[in-house]
């Protein structure tokens, strides 16, 4: 049996110039695997702990403690173990080596979710190589998923919120090519709409409005969220894809939710007089007006991460026609997912491996979501690396959807390009989620 020979971590940099953790795993039979973890800007308060150094170096964002935890604690403890035993290794790291818990489960406060996840991802890649199967196939086998599906890409083409220096409150305006025949065609549609959008924005707001945000989307200095939707609608029309390319939003509403329980759509304005503060119910009605006017199929984080009540109201009212996605609400945490299923809070999971901190717990959250009839969208973070693990994850778990930025910036394209390779490798077996993106496969 091939066993883990050595595990080594180092500090590298993400796409925002912040330190992050990378791990190398060497196996006794000569197999080598490497993985790096991403980092978010608009983070949910219930995410597992991302261990940072504090102090003045790297403005407090160094990860030498997390790196040291891998090199001195996790790595030595995993030497001699079987890299194909993902569940066993993840549980050993999370339950025994770390062991910290809070009301929502294993919180990784001792070793850091960034340390544990980097090892979890690298071990998963090594396990696939030891079994001599592609990573997506290994992940599918770990989850018990028999049918592989290529996801619909959700391209974040207009950036606002915490991802951009404009006044737009809502964070992401996305396009989803649901009418494409395959992933390759979906990329073509997405790229063409993106280029048309650039031309539309340049003509209306000038050259500097086509500067891009952290995820490669444009960040024109508009304030009206509806204007973002209007720009998308126009670009889709100009590209000739009306009806084939639809719209998704990530509002990231926790970013503009105040202590007075209001939502401030003008939260980025320094001389803010509070005139754009609205209640949860008013915001809910605003979404309903958007949905009636534009081809919106997905709304993520429409309310604050603790506003379960308004979430449930929106889901009850428009959940049939639009998926309501929990990101900050759920933080890929199986306990929070279970609560949301029971309370009918939302009807889709945003899958971010670094919110929970291990491959095994991520698979658990996805399986629960699918059994409840939910949609699942695999996601990058705004601070990314060139690592492509989530592309294989989306196919292996048949999530049906992936968002990993605009078709711009190499750390975003790395994932989309990997999906093109996977589709090519699957050949005639390749299935594209398309219009079935909310339920691409039966629960497994």
From Swiss-Prot:
Any GO BP: glycolytic process
Catalysed reactions listed for this entry: (2R)-2-phosphoglycerate = phosphoenolpyruvate + H2O
CDD domains: enolase
Superkingdom of origin organism: Eukaryota
Pathway stated in the Swiss-Prot or TrEMBL entry: Carbohydrate degradation; glycolysis; pyruvate from D-glyceraldehyde 3-phosphate: step 4/5
Cofactor(s) recorded in Swiss-Prot or TrEMBL: Mg(2+)
Keywords noted in UniProt: Cytoplasm, Glycolysis, Lyase, Magnesium, Metal-binding
Family: Belongs to the enolase family.
NCBIfam families on file: eno
Record protein name field: Enolase
Lineage of origin: Eukaryota, Viridiplantae, Streptophyta, Embryophyta, Tracheophyta
